[in-house]
């Protein structure tokens, strides 16, 4: 293909994917594999989501566990999690051929590059990754969400605010000895399930950013423990780092690939250092207003506002900068 035909193929494929994903979200109410009977998303949110996934933009304005059916997650989002990084890899190789082919015509075939990137790179890595994180407790099932009993009941006032010091006796809720009228006692919780592991693996490898759950890998079912956290972080850099060396090999000058990798690595270390120092020390405004605990027996301290409490500042900074 000439570069013009290659470009047209990329745009046509992406446009078709955008249309399919948009329609899946809007009409998911009428489609199968929707055990929760979730309504279709609004057209503007569907368009926003479709553009985000097709362009690999790392933007998510919805909660997948409550707003998307299993079909939309699998046939829509997971497919785009595969084909958008594959498209990026294909375009990279078209660029490499443009550098190296002096007399040859064309920059390769987009459909061949797309297929090879998906079958030989993304699918094997995703299969291995999905099996590993599923073994750590990430859901991978077609079963609908389950309702489970809480170990202890919790109470909320009429405005939906959690009553931290509430004493619960049946349906009666008291705080500091006074009965809270119209308080609601919650004894059950809905646990969202689905085939999360297969989507999370390629989400990390393809760096799309659209997770199965609304809070992505801060959700304990999407990222259960330190090992899954480490693995998912490594997935983020695996393919980008490898492509640096692929570039050097294909232009027949490995030093160029090493140079690109080292430039990326140094910028990463610089970014991690700046963010880590500032997040660990926090700011005087936060410390003065007691929003930051400098340290406790089980926590190294730092600005934990908006952070994943299970992993602390170190892992949070690493995830954010990677």
Where in this protein do the model-derived segments appear?
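Membrane-proximal intracellular helices of multi-pass ion channels
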Residues: 1-322
